Amino acid sequence: MSAAPAPSRLIVKVGGAVARESAGRILGLAEEGHQVIVVHGAGPQITREMERRGIPVEFVQGRRRTSRAAVEVVRESMEQVNAELCAALGERAVPVLGHRDGLLAVPVPPLGQVGDPLPCRPRKILQALSAGRVPMVAPLAVGPLNVNADDASAALALGLGAKRLVFLTDVPGLFVDDELVDAIDAGRATRMLDEGRFEGGIVPKLRAAALAAASGITATIGNTLVVA
C-alpha cells in the first residue's frame, strides 16, 4: 500500500482590514488537510491608534516608518488582532507573537524600529503544525522591530518550505493599467516595481509574491497568480 501524500504547507496572509472575515476560509483550508500558517496585519488598527495618540503616520514604499513610540502601538495592535483572530478560529488556533517566538529580522535604521524579515523556522510554528493546529503569526520581530506582514509572509514561506503563499485582501487582485490581470510573471512584476508602476499597499504584496514565485512557491494576490 502506498503512503498517503503529505499535506501541503501554505502561508495565508490576511490584512487587518479583512482579518476577522477570513476565519472561515482559513478553517476550510485546514479542514482540507493543509498545514496552514496565518500571518496577519493590523494596518488600519495601528493607523487609528497612532492618530489618536498624535504619532505621525508615514509610509515609505508601502512600509511604515516606526518610531519607538509607534512600535508600542504596533505591538499592542498586533496582539489585539492576534487575539481576535485566534478567538474567531477557536481552539485550533495557536498565537505566535513574533517578537517573543523567534521571528528574525535585520534592522532598517532609516525607517526607525523596522526590520527586513529573514527566512526562519520558529519552533512554536513547527510544534503547532505537528499538533494539527493553525499558527497565527503577529509579524513583530525580535527587537522589537516592526516587520511588514507581506514581507514576513514571504520570508516564512521560504524558511518553512511552503508550497503556496496566499494573500487574502479587500481587493480582487492586481491591476495593471486599470485592468485586473489573471497572472503576471515574477520578472515582469519586479521590473514594474522598479519602474515605480505601483504605489501603496500593493507594493510590498507584489514584491513578496514575486520573491516567493521566483523561489518556486505558488503565490496569489486575490485572484491574480504570480508565477516564476
Where are these regions (language model features)?
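C-terminal catalytic "cap/lid" subdomain
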Residues: 2-228
